């Protein structure tokens, strides 16, 4: 601004009443008001009339006939030029547009910036309302028009089911992108990859054959997957309700033989159940027909623990030995003789095996192959039989009849800490991530944080020794010498605000003897007992007459020893 003009502006500004120039919301409005006032009659005459003008402004009693007064966006008043006639305005506007079109893009932007700077807040609001929809772009529609369909599909593939339903209703082009991109199929595939429940349902209902295939001639249209998704959700809700209400179908395998007085351990997969019995044998059962496929013999004592993978079965016995068997042939591949008394529990994974014994020791083994197993370290510290072990890459966890849980480093085998709290010996535990869940002959279940050793919760409800326990992300399932299996809400148990009375979801009563071992997944529990039975509690395929009181109709399969 020219110095002389700036001085005149400041002089005029100082001569104005405060109610005029302080009422402006911005410098732009102030300057606008000043320029309008400068267009009035001479400053001397103007100054003589200022008192009257201020009175008019303060009372808002300005005659609408006076063209020298206008209202600013903030409500204050100032003078303005009279608008030219419509014809003159149109000519001037057309001339401005012609000049504007001749300028470069940068000059046009600079000119518009100058215009906006001279406007009031009220005008800014109008311009903002005009520009906002122009700045919004439908990129999902625009991308396919540029041959970038795959990018639009990839963006929409991150939506969850509810958002994907809404996206289909936006417009026909969005619906086409979702359909052509098979986004419902991709959503189901993502859930199957990340959620065990979805994976299990896909296998059991056999719609997995329509997934993970890229050829269009091998898969149904997108509408098939769109209609499949709510059916899957309905199945999941039904399964959850069955768990909470105790609705299930029951299948029973009778394992009685002349010398059998209990099924001490088991493990299962989709095809088979492998069990260890008190009669020194290992029996392999077909999971569909429930018929005994094979009997493995060799131990001279009860088979107390076992674990298998796709190649080998490893068993521990009261005869103090650990045996390694070929899954396919049933032949003994290796026999480990180390412990002085019964081998009570064992775990193996990723080339490492840990066994524990009634002799109070824990043995850590390097397992290069079924025939190449060497003792790495013996862990000593418990003052009674070590009943159970579990481990991961960080910790080995052991529990004993001495009422303690001990934590050891997996890599160095050095002692880390002791978890104290149970009032009597500990019979079972499971360890995963930071959580340890243990069951004891004090009839309680305890949840522990392994990193700090704190007891997070005590679950009470069993009437006798808690013999076996397993947990997943949702629930804890425990079996006890009272013959009962209890299902607990894990997430509620980890919440200190949850009342103790709400933690046990259901008690299942079907065994007539002590429950020795159990395993479960999203759809079923399989348990074994002193009553010589293996029970399969199915929460997926529930018949119409399935009961919700913990007992349900069952079909029985009897194995007769020859």
Curated annotation (Swiss-Prot):
Knockout mutant characteristics: Knockdown of both fbxw11a and fbxw11b results in abnormally developed pectoral fins and heart edema by day 3 post-fertilization (3 dpf). At 5 dpf, knocked-down embryos show periocular edema, small and misshapen eyes, and abnormal development of the jaw.
Main location: cytoplasm
WD repeat extents: 256-295, 296-335, 336-375, 379-418, 419-458, 459-491, 508-538
Domain named F-box: residues: 149-187
Keywords, sorted A to Z: Cytoplasm, Nucleus, Repeat, Ubl conjugation pathway, WD repeat, Wnt signaling pathway
MF-aspect GO terms: protein dimerization activity; snoRNA binding
Residue span of region Homodimerization domain D: 87-136
Keyword Cytoplasm: yes
PROSITE patterns, per database record: FBOX, WD_REPEATS_1, WD_REPEATS_2, WD_REPEATS_REGION
CDD domains according to UniProt: F-box_FBXW1B, WD40
Record's GO cellular component terms: cytoplasm; nucleus; small-subunit processome
Location of this chain's protein in the cell: Cytoplasm; Nucleus
Function statement: Substrate recognition component of a SCF (SKP1-CUL1-F-box protein) E3 ubiquitin-protein ligase complex which mediates the ubiquitination and subsequent proteasomal degradation of target proteins. Probably recognizes and binds to phosphorylated target proteins: the interaction with substrates requires the phosphorylation of the two serine residues in the substrates' destruction motif D-S-G-X(2,3,4)-S. SCF(FBXW11) mediates the ubiquitination of phosphorylated CTNNB1 and participates in Wnt signaling regulation.
Subunit structure, as described in the record: Self-associates. Component of the SCF(FBXW11) complex.
Name by which UniProt lists this protein: F-box and WD repeat domain-containing 11-A
Name of the coding gene: fbxw11a
